[in-house]
Amino acid sequence: MNVGTAHSEVNPNTRVMNSRGIWLSYVLAIGLLHVVLLSIPFVSVPVVWTLTNLIHNTGMYIFLHTVKGTPFETPDQGKARLLTHWEQMDYGVQFTASRKFLTITPIVLYFLTSFYTKYDQIHFVLNTVSLMSVLIPKLPQLHGVRIFGINKY
C-alpha cells in the first residue's frame, strides 16, 4: 500500500524525463543560464560560452551520475537505492529517446561552445574534458560500474 503517494509508478525517477514538456524546459533552462551569464559585465562571450558548458556539464554529472537513490518512498524494497538517476532512467533500458536527448544535448552545447570560442586552445581543452566527463559515464558498458569503488555505496 502506497500511503501518501499520488503516482502510479513504482519509482517515478524512471519516467521523469519522458514527462510532457521536460525537454523544452531543459533547453530553456540552459538558454536562461547562458543569458544570465551574458548579463555579467566585463565577461567576454567566449568565457560565457565556456562557463555555460562547464556549469551545465557539472550539474549533469552531479545530478545524473553521482546522486543515487530516489527522493520518494518507493515500494521497490530499496532496489533503486544503489543506482544513479541515469541507471534508473527508463527502467535501465538503453538507447531510449530520453537517453539519446540527454547524450546529444552536451554534444550540441560543446559544438556551439567550440564555435563561439573560435577553437581557442584553453577553452577547447576545458570543454573537451568537461564533455568526456559526462559522456563516458553514459556508455552502456559502464551501467552499474563503479570505477575504483568510487560512489559504490
UniProtKB/Swiss-Prot annotation:
Keywords: Endoplasmic reticulum, Hydroxylation, Membrane, Transmembrane, Transmembrane helix, Ubl conjugation
Signal peptide: none
Chain ranges passing through the membrane: 22-42, 43-63, 95-117, 122-142
Subcellular location field: Endoplasmic reticulum membrane
Pfam families registered for this protein in UniProt: ORMDL
Ranges for region Important for ceramide level-sensing: 1-17
Highest taxon above the source species: Eukaryota
Cytoplasmic side: 1-21, 64-94, 143-153
Subunit and interaction comment: Ceramide-sensitive subunit of the serine palmitoyltransferase (SPT) complex, which is also composed of SPTLC1, SPTLC2/3 and SPTSSA/B.
Entry domain remark: Ceramides bind to ORMDL3 N-terminus and stabilize it in a conformation that physically restricts the accessibility of the substrates to their binding sites in the serine palmitoyltransferase (SPT) complex, hence inhibiting SPT catalytic activity. In the absence of ceramides, the N-terminus is flexible and permits substrate binding, thus liberating SPT from inhibition.
Role of this protein: Plays an essential role in the homeostatic regulation of sphingolipid de novo biosynthesis by modulating the activity of the serine palmitoyltransferase (SPT) in response to ceramide levels. When complexed to SPT, the binding of ceramides to its N-terminus stabilizes a conformation that block SPT substrate entry, hence preventing SPT catalytic activity. Through this mechanism, maintains ceramide levels at sufficient concentrations for the production of complex sphingolipids, but which prevents the accumulation of ceramides to levels that trigger apoptosis.
Protein name, entry field: ORM1-like protein 3
Species assigned in the record: Ailuropoda melanoleuca (Giant panda)
Lineage of origin: Eukaryota, Metazoa, Chordata, Craniata, Vertebrata
Record gene name: ORMDL3
